[in-house]
């Protein structure tokens, strides 16, 4: 037998309570390439040292508990314990610290986001010695990344499937989100797609309600897709929300979508759960379906600056769990999102290798080992006047979704879609010609209005609409 390595917690067992920092605060620790690293924003209770809080976070999210236990001597804590290896004060904040914790890779089940989160963001967030705790970032080492399949297809395969290159994709969430019959819903989908959109979308809370059962919606939306494709010669899609009360029902809906021949389905990954999401992602990969991911419930988790989980962590988790699209905020619309922070996690969704950059909130260098990227989706309170900023911010590999900004057009859904398509192509062309959309975007839109009455009408309706509030979660 291999002799056990004694640790301070296991040497000469003596019942009682010890400071966490005696075992779990190790400022001399050298981080391993295989360690999973976490950056926590801590707010200790008055009188509690930051080192004790950091050690408590490391302990309670790995091998530790509130008292010494004799079974510590039956394993090697040096091998399995989490370690708080650095603490730094948060500039400009009283009594807030960033605690860096390293976790041995063997603490986590391969390919399981559920197990990863159960440990790292589990009971420790209710720990009394902490007034507040927020997980700001994770470093997922290549050795652990390779245990995940990631997105079903990824950005490049999606473009190949729908045969669309050189510009962002256009979408629209059908409104009103609740209350339409399946046939009227399908009619709205058809009008938007024939007008020039690439995709339309179920809202996140459209599942299978009495006014519109899921199978009826799937059928009429599939009919709308085929009709619009025949008229336009373009590949079209509608994000059919397969989210359901059970995983079995969710897969049944995905099977139906596949049988109807539609290209893409949808899941609410936070309310549905990581286990269900990974199962659905695996089905989509095996059966050629794209998977659009909505982040409903995210703001409950990520919006407060000092407690919860930052969205960059939730975005990394989705990339591992699996999804081809993910809602990521707009910067310019009605939903929360600071520019540099948003661009930081958009890069974490799309790119293979992202350097540490604290100016964008990225605490660790992340290597995705060629895992397929996730296309960011900008949605929420945007309209044609926002198009130059959206193209400048997100580039081509993004889906820009205008719900009210399409369906609110004074002439109807199809003209609303035309207006958005014209605006997108005008801004893309202007950017490709070297024009500065940040400065000249308004001129680009006004020029395009001269040969698109649909765009001119949209610009007149929304010329005074702005959503300007301070961002709560700032760097």
Curated annotation (Swiss-Prot):
Cofactor: Mg(2+)
GO MF annotation list: magnesium ion binding; monooxygenase activity; ribulose-bisphosphate carboxylase activity
CDD domains xref list: RuBisCO_large_I
Modified residues (N-acetylproline): 3
GO cellular component: chloroplast
Binding positions (Mg(2+)): 201, 203-204
Residue list for modification N6-carboxylysine: 201
Short name of one Pfam family: RuBisCO_large_N
Domain of life where this protein originates: Eukaryota
Catalytic activity, reaction form: 2 (2R)-3-phosphoglycerate + 2 H(+) = D-ribulose 1,5-bisphosphate + CO2 + H2O; D-ribulose 1,5-bisphosphate + O2 = 2-phosphoglycolate + (2R)-3-phosphoglycerate + 2 H(+)
Residues the record lists as N6,N6,N6-trimethyllysine modifications: 14
Active site residues per record: 175, 294
InterPro entries cross-referenced by the UniProt entry: RuBisCO, RuBisCo_large_chain_AS, RuBisCO_lsu_C, RuBisCO_lsu_C_sf, RuBisCO_lsu_fd_N, RuBisCO_lsu_N_sf, RuBisCO_lsuI
Record keyword Acetylation present: yes
EC code(s) of this entry: 4.1.1.39
Membership in a protein family: Belongs to the RuBisCO large chain family. Type I subfamily.
Protein name as it appears in the record: Ribulose bisphosphate carboxylase large chain
UniProt lineage: Eukaryota, Viridiplantae, Chlorophyta, core chlorophytes, Chlorophyceae
Gene that encodes the chain: rbcL
């Amino acid at each position: 037998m291999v002799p056990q390595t004694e640790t301070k917690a296991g040497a000469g067992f003596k019942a009682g309570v010890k400071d966490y920092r005696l075992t779990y605060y190790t400022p001399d620790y050298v981080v391993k390439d295989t360690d999973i690293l976490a950056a926590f924003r801590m707010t200790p209770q008055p009188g509690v040292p930051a080192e004790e809080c950091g050690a408590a976070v490391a302990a309670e999210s790995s091998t530790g508990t509130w008292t010494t236990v004799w079974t510590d001597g039956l394993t090697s804590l040096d091998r399995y314990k989490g370690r708080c290896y650095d603490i730094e004060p948060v500039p400009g904040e009283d009594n807030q610290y960033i605690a860096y914790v390293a976790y041995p890779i063997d603490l986590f089940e391969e390919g399981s986001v559920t197990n990863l989160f159960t440990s790292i963001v589990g009971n420790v967030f209710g720990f009394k010695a902490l007034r507040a705790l927020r997980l700001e970032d994770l470093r997922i080492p290549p050795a652990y990344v390779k245990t995940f399949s990631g997105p079903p297809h990824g950005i490049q395969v999606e473009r190949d499937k729908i045969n669309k290159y050189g510009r962002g994709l256009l979408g629209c969430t059908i409104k009103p989100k609740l209350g339409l019959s399946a046939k009227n819903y399908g009619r709205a989908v058809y009008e938007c797609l024939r007008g020039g959109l690439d995709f339309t979308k179920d809202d996140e809370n459209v599942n299978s309600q009495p006014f519109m059962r899921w199978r009826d919606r799937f059928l009429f939306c599939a009919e709308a897709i085929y009709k619009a494709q025949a008229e336009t010669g373009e590949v079209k899609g509608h994000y059919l929300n397969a989210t359901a009360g059970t995983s079995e029902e969710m897969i049944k809906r995905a099977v139906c979508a596949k049988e109807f021949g539609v290209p893409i389905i949808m899941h609410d990954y936070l309310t549905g759960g990581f286990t269900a999401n990974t199962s659905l992602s695996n089905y989509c990969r095996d059966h050629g379906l794209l998977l659009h991911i909505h982040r409903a419930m995210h703001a409950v988790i990520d919006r407060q600056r000092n407690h919860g989980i930052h969205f960059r962590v939730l975005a990394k988790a989705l990339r591992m769990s699996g999804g081809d699209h993910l809602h990521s905020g707009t910067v310019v619309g009605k939903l929360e999102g600071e520019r540099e922070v948003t661009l930081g996690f958009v890069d974490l969704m799309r790119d293979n290798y992202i350097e540490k950059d604290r100016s964008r909130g990225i605490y660790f260098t992340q290597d995705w080992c060629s895992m397929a990227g996730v296309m960011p989706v900008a949605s929420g309170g945007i309209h044609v006047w926002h198009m130059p900023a959206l193209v400048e911010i997100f580039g081509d590999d993004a889906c820009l979704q205008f719900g009210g900004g399409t369906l609110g057009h004074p002439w109807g859904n199809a003209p609303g879609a035309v207006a958005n398509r014209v605006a997108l192509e005008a801004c893309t062309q202007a950017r490709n010609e070297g024009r500065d959309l940040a400065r000249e975007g308004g001129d680009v839109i006004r020029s395009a209005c001269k040969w698109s009455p649909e765009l001119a009408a949209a610009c007149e309706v929304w010329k005074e609409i702005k959503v300007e509030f301070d961002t709560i979660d700032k760097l």
